[in-house]
A protein has these predicted regions:
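Core-facing hydrophobic residues within beta-strands of well-ordered domains
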Residues: 23-24, 57-60, 160, 210
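Short coil-to-beta-strand transition motifs
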Residues: 53-59, 114
Length: 264
């Protein structure tokens, strides 16, 4: 069984092995349409650890870099990169006659290094944990936090259907805003808000705790089913959204405009 599109939570690993089949190979995989394949993926010959992708693809020089362009240590988070050319790497973009769009997409963060745009952690098992997209990571108090770290806590709460988390610029810092939809449209009262914050604080850290938790009628998604954190972040900062046509339910974006709770 292969899973892709977003990080596979620990609880989902547990569900598969307890409810579907005990001796199945469950592989969380990650790569891209642009490279027609995976950078990190499953491996039939090594152990499956819940919450982790087992290893890197053969023939691809995958690494995890610090912001300074050095390899991270196990347990540290950083940027997913490829240090050498690989067979399925795109060579140009259609209509990009001088190659500048191509270079900007992959090679501006680190010189001559493919920067994939994912925030990732290498584990002591030689595996990887996807922490979210690089451009949607949160940075409260200068600490980088992957959005998936918060999602893994929220999706296990019985009265929540799903959530979307973004960072809002606030008083020379960033504050975390968590938007949620509730099951059967339940009210999000103070007790529920406290329970969400308590769970995140206990299982993550005080830095992960959202400053505000706001109930919304729906979460915007792309036509391929991915939640659109960047679009929501732009809306709450009053910035234009460039590719609204890629959103499956653009009508829900109106709700995020001019929210009184987010007035600075």
């Amino acid at each position: 069984i292969a899973s892709t599109g977003s990080p596979l939570a620990e609880e989902s690993f547990k569900y598969v092995y307890e409810n579907i089949k005990q001796d199945v190979h469950l592989a969380s995989i990650a790569g891209g349409t642009d490279l027609v394949g995976c950078l990190v993926l499953g491996n039939l010959y090594s152990n499956v650890h819940k919450g982790e992708i087992q290893g890197q693809s053969l023939g691809i020089d995958v690494d995890v870099f610090t912001d300074g362009g050095k390899s991270t240590k196990d347990g540290d988070k950083g940027e997913l990169v490829v240090k050498k050319p690989f067979p399925s790497m795109p060579v140009k973009f259609w209509g990009d006659s001088n190659g500048q769009k191509y270079l900007k997409a992959y090679f501006t963060r680190f010189k001559n290094i493919w920067h994939h745009g994912d925030f990732i952690e290498r584990t002591s098992n030689n595996g990887f944990i996807m922490r979210g997209r690089s451009d949607s990571t949160l940075n409260p108090g200068g600490v980088r936090i992957g959005t998936s770290e918060i999602y893994q806590q929220v999706e296990d709460i019985d009265f929540i259907t799903e959530g979307l988390v973004v960072g809002q610029d606030f008083k020379d810092d960033v504050r975390i805003i968590l938007f949620v939809t509730t099951k059967n449209n339940q009210e999000l009262d103070n007790e529920k808000v406290k329970s969400i914050k308590s769970r995140i604080r206990k299982n993550c850290s005080p830095k992960h705790v959202p400053s505000l938790i706001i109930k919304v009628p729906a979460i915007p998604r792309t036509k391929s089913g991915k939640i659109v954190e960047i679009a929501v972040r732009k809306i709450i900062h009053g910035e234009p959204i460039n590719n609204k046509e890629a959103i499956a339910n653009p009508e829900v974006l109106k709700f995020f405009e001019n929210l009184p709770q987010l007035k600075l």
